[in-house]
């Protein structure tokens, strides 16, 4: 995988204090039973088109992946989850999911759980304007897009941030003025690839 495709994940992980590798003991780690880090995600995670104006590039079922995390940093009160496609919209990027206020007691999401509003998180606002998981609509005939998932452990109380925040607004809350991430305790990330060889 080329390094340029990991820009958002790496930048977020470094900025929010991710260190080491998933193989290291006691490292904050994000995993999925739906796909392996750096591998192709299944068709079902792609958007169905229901929240995209019936975009013909949306060929899936909008089933959100399963996620779990371990070795949560000390002092964590809630988590932020961000999903983005840096290659979407011709390189302008697409933010697919912004979720925060995930209580520290939550250790993961089952498959399909966050493709709708849930009391396990506060919904932000992605590029498509929805506050829940909105899967890939990768154009056919392109190289695989790299969908980044970043989980940030924070010291925010679960209800501290209002609903409807964008990714940029959330990251500004975590690291005011683009300076030190004063509200982050650590971060973990994954990359899932998606390629569209299907027709609706």
Where do the language-model regions lie?
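Bacterial N-terminal signal peptides that target proteins for export
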Residues: 1-9
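Intrinsic disorder/low-complexity detector
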Residues: 7, 21-22
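Bacterial N-terminal signal peptides
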Residues: 9-17
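N-terminus-centered regions that define maturation/targeting leaders and the start
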Residues: 22-200
């Amino acid at each position: 995988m080329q390094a340029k495709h990991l820009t958002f994940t790496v930048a977020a992980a470094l900025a929010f204090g991710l260190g080491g590798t998933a193989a290291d003991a006691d490292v904050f780690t994000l995993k999925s039973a739906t796909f392996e880090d750096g591998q192709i995600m299944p068709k079902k995670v792609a958007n169905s088109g229901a929240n995209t104006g019936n975009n013909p590039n949306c060929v899936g079922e909008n089933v959100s992946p399963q996620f779990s995390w371990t070795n949560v940093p000390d002092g964590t009160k809630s988590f932020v989850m961000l999903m983005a496609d840096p290659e979407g919209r011709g390189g302008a990027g697409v933010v697919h999911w912004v979720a925060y206020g995930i209580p520290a007691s939550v250790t993961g999401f089952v498959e399909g759980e966050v493709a709708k509003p849930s009391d396990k998180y506060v919904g932000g606002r992605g590029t498509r304007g929805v506050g829940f998981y909105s899967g890939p609509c990768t154009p056919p005939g392109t190289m695989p897009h790299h969908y980044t998932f970043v989980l940030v452990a924070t010291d925010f109380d679960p209800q501290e941030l209002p609903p409807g925040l964008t990714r940029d607004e959330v990251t500004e809350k975590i690291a005011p003025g683009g300076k030190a991430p004063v509200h982050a305790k650590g971060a973990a990330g994954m990359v899932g690839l998606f390629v569209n060889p299907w027709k609706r």
